[in-house]
A protein has these predicted regions:
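GST-like domain detector, emphasizing the conserved glutathione-binding G-site
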Residues: 1-131, 143
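Residue-level recognition of oxygen-bearing side chains
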Residues: 69, 181, 194
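Phosphate/oxyanion-binding loops and surfaces in catalytic or ligand/nucleic-acid-binding neighborhoods
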Residues: 77-81, 169, 192
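GST-like fold's C-terminal all-alpha helical module
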Residues: 97-191
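Acidic/histidine-enriched, glycine/proline-rich intrinsically disordered or flexible terminal extensions
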Residues: 202-217
Length: 217
């Protein structure tokens, strides 16, 4: 199996979900190693000492330690749905929207999700801080079905798992929140075959376990 890249992943991690979606759509096959974050296998830490997932170890031994690098790599090999088939100025706009997600929205999301760990402010205050970004997404989605056009892009896939996390913090609140287009977009992704296929459960990997090919054939 030395000729197949290795993916260290954690099922519910939004960064890992975006990577698995891109890997699955590209068809670039990997050996999936499901990780328990509280008990990381030494092989992961040897491959990438910073200890976050997702991580890909390529066949030549080089390591990708950032989810977006994994997306870029597999889509550069195969991008059958044209997720990155956009003009360079649009790709730059996508990169900005993703960066805002990964930097500020993610921070507000964590504070909202784990509000009990951040007693300085109320859960509602943390949720309100998520609004500027979510409204930006809502504005885009109220004029087109996906963030940058009629069809799915790299940005939709990179951002969707985080909006999903937001929606799950208080599902009742989200169901009546002022984000109808965002809800619709989220619902289409969350019930789509691609997302469902990448959420399959795998047992945590340990040295000596048989390799699990992902996407499975
Ligand atoms: N910038 C990284 C972030 C990855 C990340 O933070 N992953 C979380 C899980 S969602 C993690 O592995 N945290 C380490 C831990 O909880 O020990 C990426 O894009 O891949």
């Amino acid at each position: 199996m030395n000729d197949v890249p290795i993916l260290y992943s954690f099922r519910r991690c939004p960064y890992a979900i975006r990577s698995r979606m891109a890997i699955a759509v590209s068809g670039v096959q990997m050996q999936l190693r499901e990780v328990v974050l509280k008990n990381k296998p030494p092989e992961l830490l040897l491959t990438s000492p910073k200890g976050t997932v997702p991580v890909v170890r390529r066949v030549d031994g080089s390591v990708l330690e950032q989810s977006l690098d994994i997306l870029d790599w597999v889509l550069s090999i195969s991008d059958p749905a044209g997720w990155k088939a956009y003009p360079s100025d649009v790709l730059a706009e996508m990169a900005n929207l993703i960066e805002e997600n990964d930097v500020s929205f993610k921070q507000h999301l964590d504070q909202y999700k784990y509000a009990d760990r951040y007693p300085d402010e109320s859960k509602e205050t943390y949720r309100a801080r998520c609004h500027t970004y979510l409204q930006k997404l809502e504005d885009r989605l109220s004029v087109q079905p996906h963030l940058f056009s009629e069809r799915v892009s790299y940005a939709d896939v990179a951002i969707f798992p985080f909006v999903r996390q937001f929606s799950k913090v208080d599902e009742q609140w989200f169901a009546q929140a002022p984000y109808p287009a965002l809800r619709n977009w989220l619902g289409r992704f969350a019930t789509g075959d691609l997302f469902i296929s990448v959420m399959k459960k795998y047992k945590p990997w340990r040295q000596g376990n048989p390799s699990m090919l992902f996407p499975s054939i």
